[in-house]
Amino acid sequence: MNVSERLAASAVVPVVVLDDAKDAVATAKALLAGGVDVMEITFRTAAAADSIKAVAESCPDMLVGAGTVITLEQCKKATECGAKFIVSPGFDEEVVRWCVENGVAVTPGCVTPTEIMAAMKLGLNVVKFFPAGVYGGLSAMKALSGPFGGIKFIPTGGVNGQNIGEFIAAPFIHAVGGSWVCPKADIAAGNFEKITKLCKEARAAALGFEVAHVGVNCEDADAASAVCEKLNEAFDLPVKDGNSSMFASSGIEVMKSMFKGKNGHIAIRTNSVELAVAGLAKKGFAYDESSAKYKNGRMTAAYLKDEFGGFAVHLLQK
C-alpha cells in the first residue's frame, strides 16, 4: 500500500505531541499494539524532528509523518529525519509544490472551495479539514463533496471516540485525525497501556461492527417460502419476498438456493467495508474479491473466504 492507502486503512491518524524525543518510540509501539500503524508527530514542540527520526529508525512497521508543518524549512527537516508524509494546518503552495515535486505525500488543510481547487491544481485528491468542528464538520464536507466529488477529507478537531463512526461511514472521508487516542499527558506520564486501549477502542468504533442478519440456505423457493411461513406463524415475523431470497423480519434471510456457507451465512454491518477488509486482512482473514459489490466506486459488500462454524460471513456497508 502507498502512503494514502495506509492512512485510509488505519482510519484514525493519531496527532502526537511530544515534549521529549525519548518518549517517541514507546508511543509508536503503544499505537502499533492498538492496531494503529500510522502517526503524525507535530512540529508544535522542539522535539518533533528528533522524535520523527527515532521512530523512523526504530519502528519499521510504523508509518511516521510530520504535522503542523507551516514552513518549507520544517518540511525539508521532517523528510530528512524520515517523515513519510507531511500534514499542514493550511494550504501553503510552496510546501505543497515542493512535496509534489519530490514525491512526498502531503495533506494540506483546505476548508474553502478556493483552497481545494488550489490543491487539485497540484494533483492532490486528499486534504485535511481543520478545525473540523469550527468549519461545519460533516455537513460542510458533504456540501463541498458535491462540486468536488474526487476529493476526500481527513477531518481533525472535533472528532472523538463517540463520533468517529459517523465520520468514517461518510463516503467523502478518507480517515480522521485526532489527539484523543494519544493524550499528551498520558505520554508524559508513561501511560502507554492506556494509549493502546484508546487506539483499540477508536478502531472498534470506526469499524462499528454489528450483526445485520443470519442467512439460512434452502433447496429452492418453495422450501424458503415454507420456512418463512413457519417463522411468521410462530413469531408473527413479517415476510418480504425477493429475487434470490426472502426475509422474515430484517434479521433472518432465507435463501431460495443452497447459497454460500455450509450452514448459511452471517451478515455483519460496518461503517466501512473497505476499512473492514483491510483490517481483517492484517489478521489473516482475506475476502473473496469476486463477491465484492460497489456503488459509486465504494465497496459496499463482500464475503470473507473463511467460514465460521460452517457459516459464510458477509460484510455490509451501513
Predicted regions: what they are:
Residues P14, L31, A78, V127, ...:
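Conserved, mostly hydrophobic/aromatic
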Residues V3-V17, R203-C228, G261-I268:
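N-terminal beta-strand motif that seeds the catalytic metal site of vicinal oxygen chelate
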Residues T27, T71-C81, T114-L122, S139, ...:
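Catalytic cores of alpha/beta
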Residues C99-V104, A185-G208:
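C-terminal helical cap(s) of enzyme catalytic domains, especially alpha/beta-barrels
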Residues G251-K256, A281-K318:
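Vicinal oxygen chelate
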Residues P89-V95, K128-L138, F172-I195:
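Glycine-rich phosphate-binding active-site loops on the catalytic face of alpha/beta enzymes
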Residues V15-V17, D37-T45, M62-I70, C75, ...:
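Catalytic beta/alpha-barrel core
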Residues T27, R44-A46, G215-E253, A276-K282, ...:
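Core segments of cupin and vicinal oxygen chelate
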